[in-house]
From Swiss-Prot:
Main function: Copper-sensing transcription factor that regulates copper uptake by transactivation of Ctr3, a high affinity copper permease. Binds to the palindromic UAS sequence 5'-TGTTGCTCANNNNAGAGCAACT-3'. Also transactivates Sod2, a mitochondrial manganese superoxide dismutase through the palindromic UAS sequence 5'-GTTTGCTCA-3' with 352 bp separating the two inverted repeats. Loss of function indirectly leads to rearrangement of mitochondrial DNA associated with senescence in wild-type strains.
Biased composition, class Polar residues, residue ranges: 92-103, 521-530
Native source organism of the sequence: Podospora anserina (Pleurage anserina)
Residue ranges of the annotated DNA-binding region, renumbered to this chain: 1-41
Residue ranges with Pro residues bias: 287-314
Protein name, per record: Protein GRISEA
Length: 597
């Protein structure tokens, strides 16, 4: 039996099953205090003038237990494991003894064998001639692309898959397609007869064994005509040099920059005019390629401004040295021409700079809302953090503390603690406080959930553990009340005051349920009924195990039905002057104690 801070505790199922002395679930379940053997008290043993603490139980929630808050995937997995499947029913013993079940299983095996006949391995045994192929609606085999329509498609015979079936045969092989005459007489109107065949680049050649008709179409076996190469944009002649970038490798530009240093070195030799003329002669060779690739935004285009300056000396051949200087001075003007293209790069960082504040603004607003507005106000709150001093043996969590944590706006310290505690699941003890993460929401009914410790299932868990005692206590209270004298109640009420441990109750009287088992005078009266309580037995002292209170969270549950006697109540109104009244005249009760005695 676990003993936590001198209090014997056990789980609820072990208390109900009279196994509290053998309980070893101190790391798995919520621990409930075990009452001492004997009949419960017929009256409230709390001292007069003090709040009744009999209506509450201090339970211990293990910190090492797994979080019982269910997840969607875990529930589906566990439910699928325990739900009986139809495959398991024939294996049950009843199905083996019943003849009908055996026949059903046999029929099921036959159906399974029939299904296996459709396996991929059985497709190899099928006759290819008996397979009926259905072409696509567009005749091309690709979705969304229309096929080429030819005027002779109707004379090619029935397409594959559209073969009429005979009266006795289910599959009829398709007849060979009829290709008809040459395609030259049936050219489409879009290509006139006088148009010469297209000229393809030398790197694109048609194989010799393929016979081409007019227009470059090749007849295929299925009755269609396909072009071996894509029809170029220029059909009536060779492509210009500017389009070679699309049909072949670009012209080698590195040869031109090599000539520029030689041309620039000639003016330094003394013949300035020859250098300029030489640059002018080589300039027309360089002027041809630039105009065509100019609109293309490719990297070679950026190298073209370096080649453009040589034509400028051609306009001023009089001064060789001046022309070279003018060419160098004229090189900067083409660079501003490239500035519009270069200005395309700054908008990208500008867009990024404009986008990042838009992304950072919601974060700042969200953090301000988290500081000024309590996260618990949102219905999706999953983390609850208690101060470090709460949840201990001396200061257990009670409904007032729980409501305070829920309704109080968070401080900066409380706001930082949930962040460090959100990584792991379950109960987490941090330096700043105790936190628990629960994904069930406000309707959580998990037993031992630190975020919702006062749910109905938690209260029912404790009430079920004490239900046998309460039933016997009600029957015993009727007998004791009949045999007890009026002066016995004040004595029993005042007896806890004379106990030396009485002064220790005020600091923690709201949370400690130790006073009920304190009065030992009644234990002798209830010794005859010792076998009645099912909770604790004296001989099992070897099974007791001392546990530290640091491994548990303590919660005080307000359960009023656990009090053995009647709670503090008075039928009078506020003007009550009854001597010894525990509600209205608590100050005069010690004076009347002597009269009762």
């Amino acid at each position: 039996m676990p003993i936590i801070n001198g209090q014997k505790m056990a789980c609820g199922p072990c208390i109900r099953g009279h196994r509290s002395t053998k309980c070893n679930h101190y790391n798995e379940r919520v621990m409930v205090p075990v009452r001492k053997p004997g009949r419960p008290l017929s009256t409230c043993p709390c001292p007069p003038g003090k709040p009744c603490v009999c209506g509450g139980v201090r339970v211990a929630i293990p910190k090492k237990q797994k979080c019982h808050c269910p997840a969607g995937t875990v529930d589906s997995a566990t439910s699928s494991e325990f739900d009986p499947s139809p495959v398991d029913t024939p294996i049950s013993p009843a199905s083996r003894t019943s003849s009908n079940r055996v026949t059903k299983s046999g029929s099921g095996s036959k159906s399974a064998s029939r299904r296996q006949s459709l396996a991929l391995a059985n497709l190899e045994r099928m006759d290819p001639n008996s397979i009926n192929l259905i072409p696509s609606p567009n005749g091309n085999g690709m979705i969304g692309i229309t096929a080429m329509v030819s005027p002779r498609d109707a004379t090619f015979g029935h397409p594959m898959g559209m073969v009429p079936m005979g009266p006795r045969e289910s599959f009829v092989p398709a007849p060979p397609p009829d290709f008809g005459g040459p395609m030259g007489y049936n050219m489409p109107p879009s290509m006139p007869p006088h148009m010469p065949p297209p000229h393809y680049p030398p790197h694109i050649q048609i194989p010799q064994h393929i016979k081409t008709e007019n227009g470059g179409f090749v007849p295929m076996l299925n009755g269609t005509f396909v072009s071996p190469v894509p029809i170029p944009a220029f059909v009536d002649g060779p492509h210009p040099q500017g389009m070679q970038a699309f049909n072949g490798p670009p012209p080698p530009p590195p040869s031109n920059p090599v000539l520029e240093p030689s041309a620039m070195s000639k003016p330094k030799g003394g013949s300035g005019g020859g250098g300029c003329c030489g640059g002018g002669k080589k300039a027309p060779q360089i002027q041809a390629p630039p105009p065509v690739p100019a609109p293309l935004p490719t990297p070679p285009q950026q190298q073209m401004p370096n080649i453009m300056p040589p034509p400028q000396p051609q306009n001023a051949p009089s001064g060789g040295g001046g022309s070279c200087c003018s060419s160098k001075s004229s090189q900067p003007p083409p660079m501003p021409q490239m500035s519009p293209n270069a200005m395309q790069a700054p908008p990208q960082p500008g867009f990024g700079q404009g986008f990042m504040p838009q992304y950072q603004t919601p974060i700042d607003i969200k953090m301000e809302n988290m500081h000024h507005h309590q996260p618990f106000q949102f219905p999706g709150q999953t983390v609850f953090t208690y101060p470090a001093e709460y949840g201990s043996w001396q200061m257990p969590i009670n409904p007032a503390i729980w409501q305070q944590v829920v309704s109080r706006p968070p401080t900066q310290q409380q706001h930082e603690t949930p962040i460090s505690a959100t990584a792991p699941n379950g109960n987490n003890g941090t330096v700043g406080g105790n936190s628990h993460e629960c994904g069930c929401g406000e309707g959580c009914q998990c037993v031992g959930c630190l975020a919702h410790p006062f749910n109905s299932q938690m209260l029912q868990y404790v009430q079920n553990a004490y239900s046998p005692n309460s039933s016997h206590g009600n029957s015993g209270s009727a007998d004791s009340s009949a045999n007890a004298s009026p002066s016995a109640n004040p004595l029993n009420l005042a007896s806890p005051v004379e106990i030396p441990s009485g002064p220790e109750l005020p600091p923690s009287h709201q949370t400690q349920p130790q006073p009920p088992p304190r009065p030992n005078a009644n234990e002798s009266d209830g010794s005859s009924n010792a076998p009645t309580p099912p909770n604790e037995g004296s001989p099992a002292l070897s099974n007791e195990e001392e546990l530290t209170a640091l491994d548990y969270y303590f919660v005080h549950l307000p359960i009023s039905a656990l009090c053995g006697g009647a709670l503090d109540m008075c039928p009078c109104d506020e003007s009550c002057e009854c001597v010894g009244c525990l509600v209205h005249n608590t100050a005069g009760f010690p004076q009347g104690d002597g009269g009762f005695s």
